[in-house]
């Protein structure tokens, strides 16, 4: 299914060019630093013909942009590199139409409770995309939560509606990296959660249940309904598999 999607994008590249899709992807912050106040933030890579030529400058025969480069890129494989924070910012952009600038510090208080340092969030940027395209993406991500394999069953235990997507990062000779990204509430987005589990397997199996529980905590904390003391999560000794590939909505 994923390669069928990739083929459609490859066929379109003959009309729109070899880097039009990359330019669109970059509108959502991928391939750029988010601006968070942390040293050595990774920029990531959204490969283009120019990037590949430069990367393989000492091996020109390897630097030629091939049809497979486009098909790999559009499904997140090949030379694509992204961070969980970049994905969170990108999902926020889809949800709200604005890319936030993440920050760690809100304020510092002294021993008397007085605020001595305060930071206002930096103004985000708006991706240069059509509103209709955002609606298509929102609907597709909502469809994953409603229609993809076992995800709807897992999500029914929570009182919120979300938009989400699973993923599995592949690395040769290693188990897959389990990915899951989501935003909620769907009709009034306030929170984004991205979860990555190193060599955790499929995103729907390992990352999705954790992200969904974190999202539930965020929403309850925000509306003041969280109760009880923080729970200590016991060691995970069993993995419950949810049927589905994460490709439930591909239209």
Give the predicted meaning of each segment.
Residues 1-194, 243-251:
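Beta-lactam-recognizing serine transpeptidase/beta-lactamase-like catalytic domain environment
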Residues 83-89, 206-213:
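Short amphipathic alpha-helical face segments that pack within enzyme cores
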Residues 98, 195, 218-222:
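Conserved NTP-handling cores and scaffolds of large molecular machines
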Residues 115-122, 210-251:
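Short, gly/Ser/Thr-rich active-site loops of penicillin-recognizing serine hydrolases
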Residues 127-130, 203-208:
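A short, polar/proline- and glycine-enriched secondary-structure boundary/capping micro-motif
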Residues 198-201:
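A generic structural motif
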């Amino acid at each position: 299914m994923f390669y069928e999607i990739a083929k459609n994008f490859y066929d379109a590249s003959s009309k729109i060019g070899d880097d039009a899709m990359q330019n669109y992807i970059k509108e959502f912050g991928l391939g750029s630093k988010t601006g968070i106040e942390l040293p050595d933030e990774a920029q990531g890579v959204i490969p283009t013909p120019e990037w590949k030529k430069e990367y393989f400058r000492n091996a020109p025969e390897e630097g030629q942009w091939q049809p497979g480069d486009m098909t790999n890129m559009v499904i997140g494989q090949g030379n694509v590199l992204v961070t969980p924070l970049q994905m969170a910012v990108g999902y926020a952009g889809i949800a709200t139409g604005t890319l936030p600038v993440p920050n760690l510090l809100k304020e510092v208080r002294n021993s008397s409770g007085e605020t001595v340092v305060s930071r206002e969030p930096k103004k985000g940027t708006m991706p240069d995309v059509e509103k209709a395209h955002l609606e298509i993406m929102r609907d597709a991500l909502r469809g994953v939560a409603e229609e993809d394999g076992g995800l709807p069953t897992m999500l029914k235990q929570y009182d919120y509606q979300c938009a989400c997507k699973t993923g599995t990062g592949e690395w040769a000779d290693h188990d897959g990296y389990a990915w899951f990204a989501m935003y909620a509430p769907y009709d009034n987005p306030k929170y984004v959660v991205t979860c990555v589990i190193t060599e955790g397997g499929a995103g729907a199996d390992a990352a999705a249940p954790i992200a969904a529980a974190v999202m539930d905590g965020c929403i309850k904390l925000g509306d003041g309904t969280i109760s009880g003391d923080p729970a200590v999560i016991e060691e995970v000794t069993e993995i419950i598999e949810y049927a589905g590939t994460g490709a439930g909505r591909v239209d």
